[in-house]
């Protein structure tokens, strides 16, 4: 389907006169080219026409955003009036709340439509400029990028609107009685299960996702008495590692006890409260859960603490004096601080990677049953080296001024997607809420089990120093957008086609080639970021690595397992078609030409020279039980053969009888030593997730042969005697 036709079918009817006149611009290029080539005057006229279209789109988007803010302010006034009437003689009735809810729902739809409006016009400008540069021979792309940056309708941030709408909608939905959190919700410590999964969200779907979630969960605001500002959502972490990248490898390979140490702060750089955190990975077979622990530390003491000059006793002296925490809690924090300090000093840890993102958290205050966080504008920055941090624990030449344009390309990776994390706490056998099911099974998200910002940062920023890459590494060059599976927000689209379902086609050219841009060009910024994040100039890999089915350590939903990882399987294996008994579904976007999908998935990936893709393998606890059962079966056989040998030896009166008894005893000893060696070898390889053969091709046959030999020898010796 041509983009012009697609634009007509997916635009909002109410906004149709404010869209880019794509057909007019396209015809203008064709008409002037047909008249004898493209002259300087033609270029000037076309740029002027393009400027008018940009002014039209930018003015409409700006005015519409102001209108939305005004409508929200009006709803806030109406809500304040309802609050005042709650305890009066004339309390609000159901109709008052229904009117407010209808208005808020309409505002949400408007915000959603505005986001889609910006997305579609952004794509239209890209398409027409690409067509211009291709057919005229004049390069307009870099020049017009500056004009777009001056009128950035496509960079509108809706976070403030989402927070305001969340607060209002939560009040109206609960009819003036906001639900208070229950810290014990979900069961006691003995009968509930925690489940966590991570997803990628394409930027085009972020606004729709936020609006859908806030209809069920309010945005968690830690300081409701303060007006929300963008810096309130900023979270910055400094990850530490040593020169051998041991902590990176440990976290990537999911080694038992693997640690990650980071220093984190919230908001601006002038925040004096730093949190030192340690994440420890635990394997399922240990019966323990992975844990994250942290303790606070003032910024002025961080350098001294990391050098060992500032002792743990000094760090917690004030906390002991204040008495706000129990002695047991303080001792636990001190023990953690000592362990972290010892690890940093003994293993030569230094700052390596900084992660920055803006987090929107959705949760009922104090209620841990459903917790959702969405991290946007994720940036991973090099923190190592004297030219950056020197002797300081963090570099000071940057703050939270995303997108950090002052940094060179080799120092930063701007992650192309938002990160959605869903945490559930439910009783055993209890299903998650239906709306959560709909969310994680929808086209808005792409499941990425065990995704790690630290691992991705090291693997991209230090690409030349690592040999193992995370399993999602090849996925970075594949468009994760999928056809719409649910209509979460009822917008004003003229047709029933959901704009996010066409995005994968819109942003892919007719030759099925992904869009990439260079330099400061505005065009398809997320594709530029994604492609540059690999730190590899060769788009074609050379050394083949086979990929097995991906699995995640903690499964959120059975259905999510089938649908959520669809494009991973399509990318890592062959394109799946007409599979009925598989866990995955095909999600190649198709419109009028189903035989020619506009998103192409590679049938096979090969890793770069000298690199290997590490695919996580889940080891079920029953694997160890099966290993133990096999070992016990061998021991049972050994006991039987040993008992026979000892019995024969007890009644042996002749030399042949003693030799016969000895043959059974030797068989028993051989079985004990062999089975013990095999058990230990298998246990070590399973714990290390080594890709070796675990079947015993020779052991059972050898046992049968020597058993037959022992019996035969005993018969022959007794017959001769």
From Swiss-Prot:
Biased composition (Polar residues): 490-513, 529-547
Enzyme Commission number(s) from the entry: 2.7.4.1
GO CC, alphabetical: endoplasmic reticulum; fungal-type vacuole membrane; vacuolar transporter chaperone complex
Record: active site: 453
Membrane protein topology class: Multi-pass membrane protein
Primary location group: membrane
Residues modified to Phosphothreonine: 497, 534
Names of required cofactors: Mn(2+)
Keywords: ATP-binding, Chaperone, Manganese, Membrane, Metal-binding, Nucleotide-binding, Phosphoprotein, Transferase, Transmembrane, Transmembrane helix, Vacuole
Residue numbers binding ATP: 198, 262, 264, 279, 292, 357, 359
InterPro entries reported for this sequence: DUF202, SPX_dom, VTC_Complex_Subunit, VTC_domain, VTC_sf
Vacuolar topological domain: 653-657, 719-721
Cited PROSITE patterns: SPX (PS51382)
Cytoplasmic side: 1-631, 679-697
Transmembrane region(s): 632-652, 658-678, 698-718
Domain SPX: 1-146
A GO molecular function held by the record: polyphosphate kinase activity
Domain notes: The SPX domain has very high affinity for inositol polyphosphates. SPX domains may integrate inositol pyrophosphates (PP-InsP)-dependent signaling to adapt cytosolic phosphate concentrations to different metabolic situations.
Role summary: Catalytic subunit of the vacuolar transporter chaperone (VTC) complex. The VTC complex acts as a vacuolar polyphosphate polymerase that catalyzes the synthesis of inorganic polyphosphate (polyP) via transfer of phosphate from ATP to a growing polyP chain, releasing ADP. VTC exposes its catalytic domain vtc4 to the cytosol, where the growing polyP chain winds through a tunnel-shaped pocket, integrating cytoplasmic polymer synthesis with polyP membrane translocation.
Family, per entry: Belongs to the VTC4 family.
Name assigned to this protein: Vacuolar transporter chaperone complex subunit 4
């Amino acid at each position: 389907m041509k983009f012009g036709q697609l634009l007509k079918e997916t635009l909002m009817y109410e906004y149709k006169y404010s869209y880019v006149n794509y057909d007019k611009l396209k015809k203008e290029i064709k008409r002037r080219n047909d008249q004898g080539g493209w002259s300087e005057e033609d270029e000037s006229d076309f740029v002027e026409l393009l400027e008018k279209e940009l002014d039209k789109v930018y003015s409409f988007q700006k005015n519409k955003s102001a209108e939305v803010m005004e409508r929200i302010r009006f709803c806030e006034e109406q809500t304040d009036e309802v609050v005042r009437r709650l305890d009066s003689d004339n309390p609000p009735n159901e109709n008052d709340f229904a009117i407010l809810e209808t208005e808020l729902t309409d505002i949400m739809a408007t915000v959603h439509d505005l986001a889609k409006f910006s997305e579609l016009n952004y794509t239209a400008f890209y398409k027409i400029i690409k067509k211009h540069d291709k057919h005229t021979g004049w390069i307009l792309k870099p020049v017009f990028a500056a004009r777009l940056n001056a009128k950035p309708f496509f960079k509108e941030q809706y976070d403030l609107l989402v927070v305001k709408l969340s607060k209002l909608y939560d009040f109206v939905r609960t009819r003036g009685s906001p639900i208070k959190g229950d810290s014990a919700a979900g069961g006691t410590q003995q009968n509930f299960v925690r489940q966590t999964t991570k997803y990628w969200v394409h930027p085009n779907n972020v606004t729709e996702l936020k609006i859908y979630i806030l209809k069920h969960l309010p945005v968690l605001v830690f300081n409701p008495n303060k007006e929300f500002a963008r810096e309130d959502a900023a979270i910055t972490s400094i990850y530490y590692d040593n020169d051998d990248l041991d902590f990176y490898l440990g976290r990537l390979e999911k080694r038992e006890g693997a640690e990650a140490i980071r220093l984190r702060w919230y908001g601006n750089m002038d925040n004096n409260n730093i949190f030192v955190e340690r994440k420890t990975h635990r394997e399922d077979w240990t019966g323990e859960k992975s844990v994250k622990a942290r303790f606070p530390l003032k910024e002025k003491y961080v350098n001294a603490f990391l050098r060992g000059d500032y002792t743990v006793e000094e760090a917690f002296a004030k906390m002991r004096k204040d008495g706000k925490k129990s002695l047991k809690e303080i001792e636990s924090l001190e023990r953690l601080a000592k362990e972290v300090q010892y690890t940093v000093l003994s293993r030569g840890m230094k700052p390596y990677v900084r992660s920055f993102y803006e987090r929107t958290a959705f949760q009922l205050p104090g209620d841990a049953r459903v917790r959702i966080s969405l991290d946007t504008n994720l940036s991973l920055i090099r923190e190592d080296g004297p030219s950056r941090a020197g002797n300081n624990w963090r570099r000071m030449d940057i703050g939270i001024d995303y997108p950090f344009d002052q940094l060179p390309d080799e120092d930063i990776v701007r992650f192309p997607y938002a990160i959605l994390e869903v945490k559930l706490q439910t009783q055993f056998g209890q299903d998650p809420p239906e709306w959560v099911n709909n969310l994680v099974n929808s086209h808005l998200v792409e499941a990425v089990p065990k995704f790690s910002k630290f691992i991705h940062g090291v693997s991209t920023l230090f690409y030349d120093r690592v040999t193992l890459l995370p399993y999602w590494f090849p996925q970075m060059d594949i468009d994760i957008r999928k056809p719409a599976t649910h209509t979460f927000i009822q917008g004003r689209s003229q047709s029933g086609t959901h704009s996010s379902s066409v995005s994968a086609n819109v942003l892919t050219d007719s030759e099925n080639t992904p869009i990439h841009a260079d330099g400061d060009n505005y065009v398809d910024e997320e594709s530029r970021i994604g492609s540059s994040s690999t730190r590899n100039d060769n788009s074609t890999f050379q050394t083949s690595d086979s990929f097995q089915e991906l699995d995640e350590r903690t499964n959120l939903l059975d259905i999510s397992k089938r649908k959520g990882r669809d494009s991973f399987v399509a990318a890592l294996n062959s394109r799946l078609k007409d599979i009925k008994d598989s866990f995955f579904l095909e999600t190649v976007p198709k419109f009028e030409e189903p035989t020619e999908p506009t998103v192409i998935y590679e049938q096979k990936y090969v890793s770069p020279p000298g690199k290997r893709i590490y695919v996580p393998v889940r080891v079920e606890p029953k694997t160890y039980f099966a290993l133990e059962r096999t070992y016990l079966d061998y021991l049972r056989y050994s006991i039987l053969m040993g008992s026979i040998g000892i019995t024969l030896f007890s009644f042996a009166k002749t030399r042949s009888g003693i030799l016969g008894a000895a043959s059974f005893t030797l068989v028993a000893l051989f079985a004990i030593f062999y089975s013990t060696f095999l058990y230990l070898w298998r246990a070590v390889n399973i714990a290390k997730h080594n890709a070796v053969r675990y079947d015993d091709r020779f052991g059972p046959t050898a046992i049968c042969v020597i058993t037959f030999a022992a019996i035969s020898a005993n018969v022959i010796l007794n017959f001769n005697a």
